[in-house]
Amino acid sequence: MNSTNLGAIPLRARKRARTRIALVEALLNRLAQHSLDEIQVSELAADAEISQATFFNYFPTKADLLTHFIQLWSLQVGALARTVEAEHDSALAAIEALLVSTAEQTAAAPRVMLEIIVHQARNLPGPWPGPIELAERVLFLPDAEDVEDLPDTGLAGIIPELLTKAVQRGELPQDTNVEQLHLAVGSTFFGVPLLVGARHPDAVADLQRRQLQLLWAGARAQETA
């Protein structure tokens, strides 16, 4: 259970957090059927029961709202990775859980992942907005411990640290190139849904798991070569 007392957070911050989360949920619901370009701000505002003017007080554009979702997703999978790492004493197991969990969540709405891929391609390597506020972290992940410490900057805020821990634990060779392996993991995360997600969304999780096993095996093989 989260140790932060939500009641101790100012009411204005809690209202702001609830509105942002409501807008993210509205966006995800519509992305399941429509592209980001097709979705109107007026629709999102109506779904979240706010005015269009209020929407723009929170997010300059729809793209900024999608970026905000990616930040919230980062918190969610970061909490999962932290739990799995502790339970299995394995950073590689945490990476696998992160990818598989995301694939399973998006299997019912593969368009969402495709829109995220398009969004990332359009906007990288742009800077991330400011960090997610504490009230929103607590509301979004009420059962997560130390939610204020979770990274909110996408894969880049999670994977390199886990790969470094895997090297330190001996799960990967000491001479592993973490930067290159991070790129390979990212290619698996985005590439598999792009290639097969629209046609076979239920196959993405297993394919990603297999790709990761190949990556780990390749890294270990370099040590013995």
Predicted regions and their residues:
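Short amphipathic alpha-helical segment with a characteristic S/N-K-E followed by hydrophobic residues
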Residues: L23, E38, T61-L66, V77
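Hydrophobic alpha-helical connector segments
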Residues: H68, R82-N123
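Short, basic, alpha-helical segments at the C-terminal edge of helix-turn-helix-like DNA-binding modules
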Residues: V41, I70-G78
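Short hydrophobic/aromatic patch on the recognition helix
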Residues: E49-F59
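Basic, helix-initiating cap at the start of DNA-binding domains
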Residues: M1-D47
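Amphipathic alpha-helical packing segments from all-alpha helical-bundle domains
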Residues: G78, N123-R169, E179-L183, L194, ...
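C-terminal peripheral helix-coil segments that are non-catalytic and often amphipathic
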Residues: M1-L6, E104, T153, G157, ...
